[in-house]
């Protein structure tokens, strides 16, 4: 009875929100200020005390200021996005993932006493049509694939726990584009985001993505044609440009996925490049610190401490109101303060590779569990995942969040204690070999990281997913 009532309430809430979004989008053409106020009011109605009253009022103030960077950014996205895509994203990402999913996840973390993620990343295939320098995935070949049934199992079981955001990587996920579209159509209440090299995005595919409305893209790009093609191969930059033009034409949401290395940091962060991305239609992006994963990795590509400090300062500037570029960058390694440190091991996300192995992180190729013979919940209770759950945060300085890159002794200890095995599909790498490559880097980075953190005002989170975390005062 309770389940039936919950399902009815869910359907009614989604339908009601859908009507509100329709009205807001209809106003967007001629009254953006009214649209912004409506969206904040809707957020307050659904999220309530998840944010303070001051936060909601400040949001209204900023979003109704025509000169605000955030107003300009949202206007760019609204102008560019197909209405059906915008509506579906608002419902799937805004309502299902952020509102309803978050509530379910927090309840299930208490119920099951383990990490429950906010998103799941999985690889439909190990196949890739490129061979980027320093990329482990390009070495895997095409021998492993998750079946449609495997992917359906991941999403179905994830939804039962409250997970409504799924990211796909590989390999190249669009090698399996037919199954990806089939999956998105079956699970039309979740949001899918695909990391892609762009080469397989074509017009017929974009037509289907627009029809479905629940797929976004992160396109791999690394600066100029020269810096990009030097690592990713001749002709790749042109393929990305073509894909951007198609996605913009069809009003499909897309951003960028950028791996920054010792060799390309200026090329992927300078004003000219950022403005160019906006002109092409990308207004958000993920930056990833190069990781020396795999026996064939190139540790010399890891940034210097000075370069990493520059990235911290640069990304924060690009996000600030002092910068007029309508682009929102996120840095997977340097934004730990906003997510409480390491998010892997299911704390906020985990990864399933194309052989079905469940890994704590896309960069941590060790596991005790496989989706072929275990459920998502069993995976989250597996020894290595529970070691993450019991050990997070791995460092109180969230500029040193990772148990591999900045605290390599911790990953080595967890792998040994849990008996996790290497999941590298081509050339299994011992945890000693991996962590040895990180020790000098960790030692070099620590003084700079600690100096930055010592002058940083740490804000207490209203909610934190650590094993024994409790707020210093009751939440509203």
Predicted regions and their residues:
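Radical SAM enzyme [4Fe-4S]-AdoMet core and its adjacent flexible, acidic
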Residues: 1-57, 61, 229-345, 353-355, ...
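Flexible mid-to-C-terminal extensions adjoining Fe-S/redox cofactors in radical SAM and related proteins
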Residues: 4-12, 16, 20-23, 27, ...
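Conserved alpha-helical substructure of the radical SAM core
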Residues: 36-204, 476
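Short, charged low-complexity linear segments at domain edges
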Residues: 96-117, 329-332, 336, 370-387
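Short loop/turn microsegments at loop-to-beta-strand junctions
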Residues: 120, 346-348
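Short cysteine clusters
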Residues: 128, 132-135, 342, 356, ...
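Secreted/processed peptides and extracellular or luminal domains of membrane proteins
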Residues: 134, 138-141, 348, 367, ...
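Radical SAM/AdoMet-radical enzyme domain recognition
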Residues: 148-168, 174-289
